[in-house]
Each structure stands twice: as structure tokens, then as C-alpha cells.
Amino acid sequence: MDMELCMQFRDKVNENDLVYHIYRNRDGKNQWSIICSAMDWIEVVADSIDSSALSLKNDNASSVKLMTFVVCIDVLWEAVQQLHRVFIDSNTIPFKDDDSVFVKKQFPMKDNQYFKTIRA
């Protein structure tokens, strides 16, 4: 992941107090804390995720690395959903009907559902 892109987003959000003042109490909800939490988790994932550590070996260490990779993707997805709920629309799911990420699926389903299946 591109850490520089994450930092640019954080810098843009923190560029002035406008975002803070708009979202600290929006419709009685503190959405500023949601934004900050999502930015923090995206940064953690961007700093930690390492697809090069994945291996084709069938051993415990490889299983743990794969599990960590899937958890990182899941945390990233949750953070993106939270930002979507705050900035775009709280009633829709981003990329709901997308099927461009998993191009060689084992099962015919949209990417969101397919990832849930992998994660399970």
C-alpha cells in the first residue's frame, strides 16, 4: 500500500479546522472520532500489510501470515466503509456491486461477498 497516499489524505483532513468543525457534532453524532479512527487504522494497515510475506508453503507460519494478511484487508475495508458512511452516504455500502478485485473467483459472487467467504 502507498503510505504516502495515506499521509496525503491525513494532511488534507487536518489542513484546517473545517472538517473538525463540520463533523465533531453532526446530527448529534461525533463523526470526527470516526474519521480519526479510520485514518489511524488505514495507516496501521498500510504500514503493516506485506503481501511479499505470503508463501505457498503449507505450514503454521504461512497460515498465520495469510490470516494476518486477511485481517489487515478486513480492517482496511471496515475503515473505508466508515469513511464512506461519514462523507458519502450512511445507507449504502461502497463498491457493493464491484467485481473487479477478485477476477479468478472460485464462486460466482460480487467482491464484497467473496471476501466475506474467504475471511470466514
Model-predicted segments: where are they?
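Histidine-centered, metal-coordinating catalytic motifs and their short helical/loop contexts
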Residues: K104-A120
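Amphipathic alpha-helical interface segments
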Residues: M1-K105
